[in-house]
Amino acid sequence: MDFFAGIVVFVFGAVVGSFLNVVILRLNTGQSIISGRSKCFTCAKKLKWYELLPIVSFVFFRGKCSACKAKISWQYPIIEIITGLLFLLIFNFQFSIFNEFSFYFLLSTFYFLIVFSVLIIIAIYDYHHQIIPNLFVWIFNGLAFLSLFNSFRISDFGFRILNWNNLLAGFILFAFFALLWGMSKGRWMGFGDAKLALGIGWFLGITEGVAAITLAFWIGAIVGVSLIYLNKNKYGMKSSIAFGPFMILGTAISFFWGEKIISFLF
C-alpha cells in the first residue's frame, strides 16, 4: 500500500471512528444512534460540520467546545486514531493476501472492518459501564458465525462446509468463562464475557482463540497491578475493572500476529 492510499484508508477509519463514538455515547440512552445532530453535552450547542472533523477539530479547538469552552473527552480523538490505524492494519493484512483489488478483496476487507468496528464499540462501552452491550455482542457473534463457513482471510477464499473445529472452539471458550461466572456468582466475570468468548472462538479458532484469552489475562493482570501501584487510593485488590477490553485487545493481537506469537513461544 502506497503512502497516499494509506492516508485515504486512515482518514476513512477516523471518520468511522467518529461515528463509533456517537454509537457508544448514545447506546442505551434512548437517543437514536443513526439520526439527530451531534451537540455539546454541556451547553447543548448543535455542532457544525467543521466541528465534527475527526481529530482535526479536537486539535483546532484545543479539546474544548467552541461555545461554552467545556472540555471535550479525549475518547473522541483516541477512538478516531485507533480506528484509523486498525483500518490500515486490516487493509495491509488483506492486500498482502490478494495483491490486487477484486470482489473477494472488497468483500473480505469489508467483513473485517465491520467486525473490528463492532469490537471497538463493545470494548469502549464495557470500559465505561462494565457491561457488554447485548445487541453488539450478538452482532459480533453473528459475524463470527459466518467465518465458520468462510475464514475471509486465507488465499483460497471461498465458502465451505461448516468448520467444526472453530465451532467447538467457541463453545469451549464460552464454557470456560461461563464456569468462572457461575463459580464466582458474577464476581470474577460477567456473563457478557462468556458470550463474547463464544464469538472469539468462532472467529479465531481454538489455537488463536486461546492465545487471545491468554493475552487478555496477561495484559489485564499487568494493567490491574499497575493501577493499584499508581493509585492506591482509588484501586485495591477488590476493585473491579472491565475485562472485555482486554479480551478484544487480545483478539486483535492474535488476529494480526497470532501465528508469529505461537511459533515464537512453541
State each model region's role.
Residues 90-107, 111, 153-162:
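Arg/Gly-rich low-complexity intrinsically disordered repeat tracts
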Residues 17, 193, 242:
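Short, conserved phosphate/pyrophosphate- and ester-handling motifs at nucleotide-, phospho-/glycolipid
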Residues 226-253:
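Interfacial loop-to-transmembrane junctions
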Residues 20-27, 62-70, 119-131, 178-188, ...:
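C-terminal ends of transmembrane helices
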Residues 2-15, 87, 147-152, 250-266:
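Hydrophobic alpha-helical transmembrane segments
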Residues 20-75:
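Membrane-proximal soluble regions of multi-pass membrane proteins
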Residues 9, 111-219, 224, 263-266:
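Functional transmembrane core segments of multi-pass inner-membrane proteins
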Residues 20, 24, 86, 90, ...:
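Alpha-helical membrane-inserting segments
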